From Swiss-Prot:
Domain Helicase C-terminal: 532-677
Compositionally biased region (Gly residues): 152-164, 204-214
GO molecular function, one term: mRNA binding
Biological process per Gene Ontology, one example term: piRNA processing
Catalytic activity: ATP + H2O = ADP + phosphate + H(+)
EC number: 3.6.4.13
Pfam families per record: DEAD, Helicase_C
Official protein name in the record: Probable ATP-dependent RNA helicase DDX4
Length: 729
């Protein structure tokens, strides 16, 4: 993202910086549909000539071709690639431009050609708009020996036409990227790139040369396609530094006490949590606690816990709270819906209340004591609401920042005081880069859904975070990781973040599915899925249902299809604007749309009350993702149902892990699925091949201390057979 005057926005937040791209009454179509007359805002905007002031050339044409002649020498200077969108550098069209007087015979430039300008040759004349927002003067181009002509239709890595033709910095030869200005290249000027576009980067990210309007099958506004600038998981969080200026400011959450402390109703199986087996590994773990009173929390925290409806601890809370209070690093694995958020928030808040806080709205630089990072915007906002609930009536202030919202709004929230910063990775690194927060006071670093935070999607950003100037080393801070799944390779990566003596807590059948969720696997071909989905949803009625698909385009397609079938449906995925995502979740929560079609952006950590059904229209590529998806139902002891469509052609690799997950959760395993698993993996296949009651175990070699404990009595016990072990969510 280019530099912006955030101080001005902070001082005058009520002044909008948005400038409309087109004003309908400012131009009109001529008789032939080619010419658009426009009254300019200033003479400098369109150039000095009167003919330029009287006309506005509308960029675009959804074509992979460009208007105007191509410099014959250019083919040797840049790749021979077609440009998608307005006025690119591909094939030229003669006599298709816009002229003040008339089209002259043999003139193929046409772009507001002024008869008063004496062009020495066709190449110079065809450039048009010399030394302004459109096409740079031919002599400058020749002298520079490289393609620096503003945004002539967005070639190679430049997404917007009409760049500012600065001969000094539009094209960075060392970086090999062009920076653009103008409506589709710059975010500062809505019409012609009159603002300096040099500081703005191309939006395409992947180097695609996409121009003014949508071309081919790619989406210009959302940036979807194979060179999409948004990440699927975080919905564009990694793309916060690209694209048009974001002006969306999310509405503040309700401030009344009843809304803050609205709580989940526990289900009929909540009391089964006491029978769950827990394994703690590492040196000298502290004893677990049985009640909130044993945690020695301050009275304000105890009052907030009671208001939130918390009456008893879940297994992960019984072990994690004393470990965190003892200052130990922690990696905790617990099934979905098990209260992991409260497990780390309560001891952190207790420490802050006891030791005091440093951040204040009266300080120029905010230095939070705790940073919590999660992979999706929806999840981090959910964590923030929990932090706000538990810190109600205290001096601790929690702040949430995430992508898809105005960066100035995020900064304004921070400067008002920030003790606990809840953030998604991209927006966090943006704010750190702007030097709006300091890291010297960080005492707690929390990674929620840590397996996702450390994989290839966010691993580099997390490593960049812990190496930022001022960030305390892992020996000087306390690092906490929570997730429902912790693959072995992720545990190895975690060594860079955690102290060597960290404790590992595994609760129940970690990495397995909850037995409160009834799982059904149906063998459905790819082209029969839609009809089967409609059949199931009609039988379900208005019960709240989440439908998971693999791609963003399919999410919108299925949602539209279901609406045509008179089934009220909305969708959420990474290409939707943040306001649309929040609106979709709001419609789903309130029951306006009982069906939500989602990609994996909604599979992680979202806690939506009373979701009765999860349907895997497309099975995910990994069994861990399957566990996270079906974990959206059957939470806090409530029951739920998960139905998955199994396609033989695309899902066979999941047969073996599916059989294991179903067996561990004491679910019926279809005979046809066992046959596929047996034929795929051979006669040695076993549904419980690992032989462990814990699906995720500490992978450290020769770690000292390991105990299997029952959460009710906390006595060491022999691990029971999985078939006899009660499960929970």
């Amino acid at each position: 993202m280019g530099d912006e005057d955030w101080e001005a926005e902070i001082i005058k937040p009520h002044i909008s910086s948005y400038v409309p791209v087109f004003e309908k009454d400012r131009y009109s179509s001529g008789a032939n549909g080619d010419t658009f007359n426009r009254t300019p805002a200033s003479s400098s905007e369109m150039g000095d000539g009167s003919s330029r002031r009287d006309h506005f050339m509308r960029s675009g044409f959804a074509s992979g071709r460009s208007l105007g002649n191509r410099d014959p020498g250019e083919s040797n200077k840049r790749e021979n690639t077609s440009t998608v969108g307005g006025f690119g550098v591909g094939k030229s069209f003669g006599n298709r431009g816009f002229s003040n007087n008339k089209f002259e015979e043999g003139d193929s430039s046409g772009f507001w050609r002024e008869s008063s300008i004496d062009c020495e040759d066709n190449q110079t004349r065809n450039r048009g708009f010399s030394k302004r927002g459109g096409y740079q003067d031919g002599n400058d181009s020749e002298a520079l020996g490289s393609s620096r002509r503003g945004g002539r239709g967005s070639f190679r890595g430049c997404r917007g036409g009409f760049g500012r033709g600065s001969p000094n910095s539009d094209y960075e030869q060392d970086e090999g990227t062009q920076r653009s200005g103008g409506i589709f290249g710059s975010r500062r000027s809505a019409l012609s790139g009159a603002g300096n576009g040099d500081t703005f980067q191309s939006r395409s990210g992947g180097g695609s040369g996409r121009g003014g309007y949508k071309g081919l099958n790619e989406e210009v506004i959302t940036g979807s396609g194979k060179n999409s600038w948004k990440s699927e998981a975080e919905g564009g969080e990694s793309g916060d530094t690209q694209g048009p200026k974001v002006t969306y400011i999310p509405p503040p959450p309700p401030e009344d006490e009843d809304s803050i402390f609205a709580h989940y109703q526990t289900g009929i199986n909540f009391d089964k949590y006491d029978t769950i087996l827990v394994e703690v590994s590492g040196h000298d773990p502290p004893p677990a606690i049985l009640t909130f009173e044993e945690a020695n929390l301050c009275q304000t925290l105890n009052n907030n816990i009671a208001k939130a409806g918390y009456t008893k601890l879940t297994p992960v809370q019984k072990y994690s709270i004393p470990i965190i209070q003892g200052g130990r690093d922690l990696m905790a694995c617990a099934q979905t819906g098990s209260g992991k958020t409260a497990a780390f928030l309560l001891p952190i808040l207790a420490h802050m209340m006891r030791d005091g806080i440093t951040a204040s709205r009266f300080k120029e630089l905010q230095e939070p004591e705790c940073i919590i990072v999660a992979p999706t915007r929806e999840l981090i906002n959910q964590i923030y609401l929990e932090a706000r609930k538990f810190s109600f009536g205290t001096c601790v202030r929690a702040v949430v920042i995430y992508g898809g919202t105005q960066l100035g709004h995020s900064i304004r929230q921070i400067v008002q005081g920030c003790n606990i910063l809840c953030a998604t990775p991209g927006r966090l690194m943006d704010v750190i880069g702007k030097e709006k927060i300091g890291l010297r006071q960080v005492k707690y670093l929390v990674l929620d859904e840590a397996d996702r935070m450390l994989d290839m999607g966010f691993g580099p950003e997390m490593k960049k975070l812990i190496s930022c100037p001022g960030m305390p080393s892992k020996e000087q801070r306390q690092t906490l990781m929570f997730s429902a799944t912790f693959p072995e390779e992720i545990q190895r990566l975690a060594g860079e973040f955690l102290k060597s003596n960290y404790l590992f807590v595994a609760v129940g059948q970690v990495g397995g599915a909850c037995r409160d969720v009834q799982q059904t696997i149906l063998q459905v071909g790819q082209y029969s899925k839609r009809e089967k989905l409609v059949e199931i949803l009609r039988n379900i009625g208005d019960e709240r249902t989440m439908v998971f698909v693999e791609t963003k385009k399919k999410a919108d397609f299925i949602a539209t299809f279901l609406c045509q079938e008179k089934i009220s449906t909305t969708s959420i995925h990474g290409d939707r604007e943040q306001r649309e995502r929040e609106q979709a979740l709001g419609d789903f929560r309130c029951g306006k749309c009982p069906v939500l079609v989602a990609t994996s952006v909604a599979a992680r950590g979202l806690d939506i009350e009373n979701v009765q059904h999860v349907i895997n229209f497309d099975l995910p590529s990994t069994i861990d993702e399957y566990v996270h998806r079906i974990g959206r139902t059957g939470r806090c002891g409530n029951t739920g149902r998960a139905i998955s469509f199994f396609d033989l052609e695309s899902d066979s690799q999941l047969a073996q892990p599916l059989v294991k997950v179903l067996s561990d959760a004491q679910q019926d395993v279809p005979a046809w699925l066992e046959e596929i698993a047996f034929s795929t993996y051979g006669p040695g296949f076993s549904g419980n091949a690992r032989g462990n009651v814990f699906a995720s175990v500490d992978t450290r070699k020769n770690y000292p201390g390991k105990s299997s404990l029952n959460t009710a009595g906390f006595s060491s016990t022999q691990a029971p057979n999985p078939v006899d072990d009660e499960s929970w969510d």
